Amino acid sequence: MIHALEQGGVARGIAQAARVAVLALAATAVLGGCSLFSSKNKHEPAKLMEVQQVLAVRQVWSVSVGKSGRYVMQPAVAGNNVYVSAAGGTVTALDGATGRTVWQGKADVDLTTGPGSDGTLTAVAGEKGAVIAFDEKGAQKWKVAVNGEVLTAPLVGQGLVIVRTTDGRVLGLDPSNGERKWIYQRSPSALNLRSSLPMIFAGDNIILGFAGGKLGALSASNGALRWEAAVSYPRGVSEIERLNDVTGAPSVNGSQVCAASFQGRVACFDMSTGAPRWGRDFSSPTGVTQDDGGLFAADEKSVVYGFNAQNGADLWKNDALLWRDLGTPLAFGRAVIVGDSEGWLHFLSRDDGKFVARVKTDGSAIGAAPVVVGQTLVVQTRGGGVYGYLPK
């Protein structure tokens, strides 16, 4: 019997999965949420305490673009615009400062990812491995099939549209017509987290995480593996105990790239060579964010941690959001910002982890990481709300 856990309630579901004593596994079993478990197995989310608004956060615009469904629709930023998508097929470019619609396109399939964009070309992926590209006015430019499930937003830039499938392939597509330029293939793991694994450009490399706790760099020119490093190693006896996939997008600051894994570690490496700089035991279902001095992440219990980005030493932790299914955090200015499953956006001091502000969106989960367009902080909810804020 295959138990496939859909995205949504990721942190709580994965934590519970790790504690299940008896679970029939199959070679293609996947994890990514909590639908397998009845409500009696779920932890009660912490009640929110009143927060003194030390940081003024002003909502400057909001729009509705359509629901995300069971997928994580991560917004993308290019220039002054933010690009968002909805499960029903809508792709929208918004002015980051005003929320004004710059253009809107419509795919003819349901979508499974957020968009990737370089400002000229915007690409999304949909059901049955469809990859659809739109031009700078929102007109569909091409559509191809990559013959595999895609849960990660395409990465667009450097004359490429990069697509990764859940069966271990990474494809470099021609942005003019969608034809394949190169392919990188890994053997799929028997058990892995069924989640979005964003990729980033770093110079002429593509940095991305893999199942089994690995982080790697691919050449953008031909897809060759330039280096691979271990964020963590499998531990334990059962398949679930040994599950240690890299989670979230790699985080780059200067010459350092960092990543976290589930049931594994948080670790940082030299961006050019993959040489390790530091690592420590940690388990995160959503990944990390960093700035010049700190690295920040939430664990599967929704405890938020601050580490010294240079050596991994403890800075602080905040356990007031237990089991609230936090999304991927963002370091922005003097705050670490993270959304939860009830649509709250929490602002923590990056210096000591104390709350400095909190705002409410539409009440639906914020699973994707916030993004910054100019000075505007933008978040997208599963309910389809996109909100622009100015923290002061």
Curated annotation (Swiss-Prot):
Membrane topology of this protein: Lipid-anchor
Gene Ontology terms: cellular component: cell outer membrane
Lipid attachment residues per UniProt (N-palmitoyl cysteine): 34
GO biological process assignments: Gram-negative-bacterium-type cell outer membrane assembly; protein insertion into membrane
Signal peptide per UniProt: 1-33
Lipidation positions, renumbered (S-diacylglycerol cysteine): 34
Domain of life of the source: Bacteria
Keywords in alphabetical order: Cell outer membrane, Lipoprotein, Membrane, Palmitate, Signal
InterPro entries: BamB, PQQ_b-propeller_rpt, PQQ_rpt_dom, Quinoprotein_ADH-like_sf, WD40/YVTN_repeat-like_dom_sf
Keyword Lipoprotein recorded: yes
Subcellular compartments: Cell outer membrane
Function: Part of the outer membrane protein assembly complex, which is involved in assembly and insertion of beta-barrel proteins into the outer membrane.
Family in the record: Belongs to the BamB family.
Protein name: Outer membrane protein assembly factor BamB
Natural source organism: Ralstonia pickettii (strain 12D)
